[in-house]
Amino acid sequence: NVSTIQCKCNDPKHTHDNLIGVIDKVGVDDVKEYILASKDKYCKFLVTPESFHKVKKAFEELDMYMYSECFMLIDESHKLVKDADYREGIYLPLDDFFQFKGKALVSATPLELSDPRFNDFQRLVIEPQFSYDKDIHIQYTNNTLERFKVTVRDSKNDCICVFLNSTDTIYALMEKTGILEESTVFCANKSVRKLKYSLNFKNAYSRFEPKRMRKFNFFTSRFYAGMDIELECKPDLIMLSDVNLVEHTVLDPYSDMIQIVGRFRNGVNYITHITNTFTDYTYRSKEEVLREVEIYEINYNFIRRELGNAIDNGSQCAFRTLLKTSPFNQFLDRHNNKSYCAVDNYVD
């Protein structure tokens, strides 16, 4: 994401690595200028999925064949699945990815990808030869606010980091706990604007820098993966989920939690997860969910086929309406092709 790319490009460790961060404000001409200026150097593009088209366009305008000139690495590849339900652009470069002569995906928390184009890929698993287990104190509660108050009150640490994927809930926690003046929030640009201009909370940033930290530091999901948080101290780490108030605050113990703990390169002092739970949740197996998607797909393809065969306006209108309301639409990309990432996200 943007914040991770900005941090990498501004990290003194990468001063001589000839990096270019291709994000929203960087245009095709900027990329072309960088390529031409890097004639005797390796080019290293750090690109968001949404800005990948700029790199592609730059190579085309320079009459260079990107797919053989470059190696493509999709870092934090689990995001292809985890973010597919709300970030359509996350898998925009995927069709291009398979055209590269050299290509790979990497993640510390890889998820199974059902796209058949991955079937011939070799999978390399790196397993540490040392124990990397971390103790996590699970606090199950029916009142996440009150439990949060108790947790921060009992902490003796001068640095507390809280991961919670809802800026509205973050603000409510800060306000009701009375820690607004001691807090900083790291979140997306849109949320920064809301906090600063609608809620008059000034310590909100889209880019992480240690000097901006206060005693209480809140992070949304854009900071769950890919970023190095290097501190001189070992903070107390609080992960918070409130599934009844905001469902997208739910944390996956097999990916989100591992990624969050892994952000802190110098370790943490204490880890806790404050959470409640669904009261009416019905478990379904992976096979049951895939069968549901399969039936949606069969029905969608049948309607589309009938639309192609329809010759009168009434039938065509009816079939178009049925296509527009098909549940399978949530599993289509912007070209109306099946998105395996969206299917994997639904299963996950």
Region spans (language model):
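Conserved SF2 helicase motif VI
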Residues: N244-N269
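SF2 helicase catalytic motif II
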Residues: T48-F52, A58-G102
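A short beta-strand element within the Helicase C-terminal
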Residues: I229-D242
